[in-house]
């Protein structure tokens, strides 16, 4: 069975305490690999490496054009790793193999664009008009510099894409990074280290650590040697991170939960609107922070819309994420599946009308995995919990409205 190590100071390393964790395929419920599972000591070692690399100037003082060339070399190299990264991403996260391949390609394009922008379009220095005050002889300008050590804490729904977008922005501007993937979906970033070691990126500039957020993640957020934290995940954890960062006055970027509305008016093209609603709700089995799970439909077209939405949803092919024919895959973990199923029960008790799905699939081939049928509730009221709380799963709440003022 494959075993993956962390990446600190240019080397793959075991957890200092020797701890390992199992990676589980959500499509089968089976263990597919093990990986190093670190703690505070590993977090601090990664931060020390990033701090030393930044302060040395080996990356932060490098000419932007040279940094750009190195990052573009990495993007070129990643083309060779598309099949490998996409495979492990799909196996580990439950994302469809057809989508995870696209995620890697998206990262490659983003890396190239950002590298070029940082080198040739970004204004590192900007002259300003002289101020009309007593300092008439002064020269006014803005000089922009890399910030320092940036920590990226990554969600489990799009692990490689989310992690790399936190990293490549920071790297392009001359910062050093420590990234922590989610414990449920760590493998793609650990596989990525194979490519990383083939580049000219200096040691310590990029570090990848894996472990529980309660210990390793906390150690990263409270380490005084960091300069910035970027986090994507739940609102509850975001509150904790902001609180921890405040104690050392660190910059924070938070991308947290959502319960987005998808508003369908009476003059909408119904077929087009149904397509959009399905994508907005059921992409990656509903495990997307910007999912439009509150589908708010004008009462004049409400019944017709619900009928079309249910028919199209029932036609989705539920299956294993590694099958190219699958349109709707598994949930990331049993814990998340249980959360989704509990919300479906809440919706029933609240009086919402369950018109589609609402349970695990009956297909015996899917028995071992963490699957939930795409689910639709009709006649949902805004006061219901399923309409107010983020479920983070394939549960659509279709809510009628009468007029635009409402």
Residue ranges and their predicted role:
Residues 29, 67, 89, 174, ...:
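Residue-level signal for inorganic ion chemistry
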Residues 236-381, 400-405:
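ALDH superfamily catalytic-core signature
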Residues 1-35, 69, 73, 105, ...:
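Terminal low-complexity tails and localization/encapsulation signals of metabolic enzymes
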Residues 198-202, 316, 320, 384:
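Short helix-capping segments at alpha-helix termini
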Residues 32-122:
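Glycine-rich loop-to-alpha-helix module at the N-terminal edge of alpha/beta enzyme cores
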């Amino acid at each position: 069975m494959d075993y993956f190590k962390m990446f600190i100071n240019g080397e793959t390393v075991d957890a200092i305490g020797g701890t390992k964790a199992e990676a589980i395929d959500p499509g089968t419920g089976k263990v597919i690999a093990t990986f190093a599972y670190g703690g505070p000591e590993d977090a601090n070692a990664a931060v020390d490496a990033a701090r030393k690399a930044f302060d040395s100037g080996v990356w932060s003082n490098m000419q932007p054009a040279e940094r750009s060339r190195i990052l573009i070399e990495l993007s070129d190299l990643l083309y060779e790793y598309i099949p490998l990264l996409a495979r492990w991403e799909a196996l580990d996260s439950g994302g469809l193999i057809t989508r995870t391949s696209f995620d890697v390609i998206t990262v490659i394009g983003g890396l190239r664009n950002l590298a070029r922008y940082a080198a040739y379009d970004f204004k590192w220095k900007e002259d300003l008009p002289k101020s009309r005050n007593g300092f008439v002889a002064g020269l006014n300008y803005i000089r922009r510099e890399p910030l320092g050590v940036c920590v990226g804490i990554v969600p489990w729904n799009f692990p490689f894409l989310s992690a790399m977008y936190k990293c490549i922005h920071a790297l392009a501007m001359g910062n050093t990074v420590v990234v922590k993937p989610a414990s449920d979906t760590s493998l793609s970033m650990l596989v990525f280290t194979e490519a990383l070691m083939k580049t000219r990126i200096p040691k310590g500039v990029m570090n990848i650590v894996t472990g529980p957020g309660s210990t390793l993640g906390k150690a990263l957020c409270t380490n005084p040697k960091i300069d910035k934290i970027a986090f994507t995940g739940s609102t509850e954890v975001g509150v904790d991170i902001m609180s921890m960062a405040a104690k050392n006055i660190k910059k924070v970027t938070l991308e947290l939960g959502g319960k987005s509305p998808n508003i369908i008016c009476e003059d909408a093209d119904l077929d087009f609107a149904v397509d959009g609603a399905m994508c907005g709700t059921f992409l990656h089995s509903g495990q997307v922070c910007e999912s439009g799970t509150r589908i708010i439909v004008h009462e004049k077209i409400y019944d017709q819309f619900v009928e079309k939405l249910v028919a199209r949803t029932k036609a989705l092919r539920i299956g294993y994420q590694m099958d190219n024919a699958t349109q709707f895959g598994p949930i990331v973990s049993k814990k998340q599946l249980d959360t989704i199923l509990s919300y479906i029960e809440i919706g029933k008790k609240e009086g919402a009308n369950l018109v589609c799905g609402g349970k695990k699939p009956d297909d015996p081939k899917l028995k071992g995995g963490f699957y939930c049928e795409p689910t639709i509730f009709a006649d949902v009221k805004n006061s219901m919990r399923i309409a107010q709380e983020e479920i983070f799963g394939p549960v659509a709440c279709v809510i009628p409205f009468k007029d635009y003022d409402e």
